[in-house]
Amino acid sequence: MSWQTYVDEHLMCEIEGLHLASTAIIGHAGTVWAQSTAFPQFKPEEITGIMKDFDEPGHLAPTGMFVAGAKYMVIQGEPGAVIRGKKGAGGITIKKTGQALVVGIYDEPMTPGQCNMVVERLGDYLLEQGL
């Protein structure tokens, strides 16, 4: 299965009539493997900051997490495994696998829990596959 298929069929899937606003699978070095059409362009320093937070949980909390220049308040995630952020009526979930970051961005009426479920389910599957 191609990385784009994972994005199109597993991340952009319908949940109770709703979809994530945008999604992507990104390598640890910041290379985009696949993305939805509306996915914002991450800056290299943003990926560096996200990866550092996975290695040193709490690194982003004081300053916030920036994604394509937009600031997200970091909320409780799973240290070393999941980073969650909130911005206005939406937010972001990032799940780290062995080789990639699975990213989902949502806006209301989708809930944080729905976004977490979609992103973390695919991330857990990729981890099980050794990816």
Curated annotation (Swiss-Prot):
Binds to actin and affects the structure of the cytoskeleton. At high concentrations, profilin prevents the polymerization of actin, whereas it enhances it at low concentrations. The variability of the residues taking part of IgE-binding epitopes might be responsible of the difference in cross-reactivity among olive pollen cultivars, and between distantly related pollen species, leading to a variable range of allergy reactions among atopic patients. GO terms for molecular function: actin monomer binding. PROSITE patterns: PROFILIN (PS00414). Phosphorylated by MAP kinases. Disulfide bonds join C13-C115. It comes from Olea europaea (Common olive). Belongs to the profilin family. This is Profilin-3. Occurs in many kinds of cells as a complex with monomeric actin in a 1:1 ratio. It is found in: Cytoplasm, Cytoskeleton. The keyword Disulfide bond applies. InterPro entries: PFN, PFN_euk, PFN_sf, Profilin_CS. The modification Phosphothreonine is found at T111. One of its GO terms (cellular component) is cytoskeleton. A motif (Involved in PIP2 interaction) lies at residues 81-97. It holds the Pfam family Profilin. It comes from the Eukaryota.
